[in-house]
Amino acid sequence: MDCCTESACSKPDDDILDIPLDDPGANAAAAKIQASFRGHMARKKIKSGERGRKGPGPGGPGGAGGARGGAGGGPSGD
């Protein structure tokens, strides 16, 4: 069977659902889906050892020092 024929690969316009974009329930559902996906991508980056920072920021190399190092306002353990 050839899967590259037009009838097998394209959907007719009748199958596409018409969803109102101003529906509050649809907006809430979309926000939950987006938040879940962003969390998934963040966990994936952390697991692979990458950082989500785009440049040196507070606590990063050359930064102002945060909770992990540098001149912070926390206890030094002396």
Curated annotation (Swiss-Prot):
Keywords: Acetylation, Calmodulin-binding, Citrullination, Methylation, Phosphoprotein. It comes from the Eukaryota. The modification Citrulline is found at residue 68. Residues 26-49 form the IQ domain. Residues 55-78 have a biased composition (Gly residues). The keyword Cell inner membrane does not apply. GO terms for molecular function: calmodulin binding. SMART domains: IQ. Residues 38-78 are annotated as: Disordered. The record marks 38 as: Crucial for interaction with calmodulin. The modification Omega-N-methylarginine is found at residue 68. Residues 50-78 form the Collagen-like domain. Is highly enriched in brain. Accumulates postsynaptically in dendritic spines of neostriatal neurons. Signal peptide: none annotated. The N-terminus is blocked. Phosphorylated at Ser-36 by PHK and PKC. Phosphorylation prevents interaction with Calmodulin and interrupts several learning- and memory-associated functions. The modification N-acetylmethionine is found at residue 1. The modification Phosphoserine is found at residue 36. Acts as a 'third messenger' substrate of protein kinase C-mediated molecular cascades during synaptic development and remodeling. Binds to calmodulin in the absence of calcium. Belongs to the neurogranin family. Neurogranin is intrinsically unstructured; however, upon binding with CaM, The IQ domain adopts a helical conformation. This is Neurogranin.
